[in-house]
Amino acid sequence: MYQHTHHLDNQSILDVRDLQVRYNGNLALENITFHLHSGERVAVVGPNGAGKSTLFKVVAGVLPSSSGEVSIYGSGPRSHICIAYIPQRSQVDWNFPVSVADVVMMGRIAKLGLLGWPHKRDWELVQRALETVHLADLSKRQISQLSGGQQQRMFIARALAQKSELMLMDEPLSGLDAPSQADILSLLDTLKSQGVTVMVATHDLEQAAQYFDRIMLLNHRLIGFGSPDEVLQPAMLIQAYGGRLRKTEDGKNLAIDDSCCGEGETHEHAH
């Protein structure tokens, strides 16, 4: 079971040092080192198969590392209840018979313990979280009946009810229409105002540059980590994307062809 761990004000919320992860003898992540501070909003970008999901799972304590160190406020991920991990929607069984409110209440279970029973205060926090993400009127609906955007907002509500301090979101904008993406990005502003540190895996470099404080460019190793202007440079992008990177016809933009983004879809970044 998770334990409550005291947090010091001057600590980094997340420290990753010399992280390596192997799958069946193959190196998925190599020599990854970075630090995050409270309230930061970080986009994690890189080609399909670069290790973004693997990184999130290791930080969340879902997967073990082969070597290196991951610490949340100075101790391992499994020592904390402040981490919220939101997987890709394709990894969720949406036919599981559970309501929206029940899923959001799961954010309180870590606080209560497996044998704990929700109190009035817990349901009030669930209701408040649902109101924040504009799903209060859908609280009794089965999760299979939600749209893609509503599904992502439900998971954000669960993290809010959990009172998470570090949120890991694996491609939350993928497959959503523009209004739904705008809703999620607006909620990221709400999280930032509450001091929540957010890491978001995304394939959209324009959104990464516009909405995030820092960008992590990943392809099994850490190629760049800094402000959008520092990281979204042609030399670094070529290291990460290789042959997927090309100039657009006007010669002013860099376009990335990435099969995971959809048939024939490209993403551009101006330089």
Q: Which positions does each model-derived feature cover?
A:
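The feature captures the beta-strand-to-loop junction immediately N-terminal to the Walker
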Residues: 45-47
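Helix-to-loop junction immediately C-terminal to a conserved catalytic motif
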Residues: 60
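Conserved ABC transporter NBD signature motif
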Residues: 68-83
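Conserved ABC ATPase "signature" region
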Residues: 105, 120-138
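Conserved ABC ATPase signature
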Residues: 142-146, 150
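Catalytic Walker B motif of ABC-type/P-loop ATPase nucleotide-binding domains
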Residues: 167-171
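ABC ATPase nucleotide-binding domains
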Residues: 233-234, 238-271
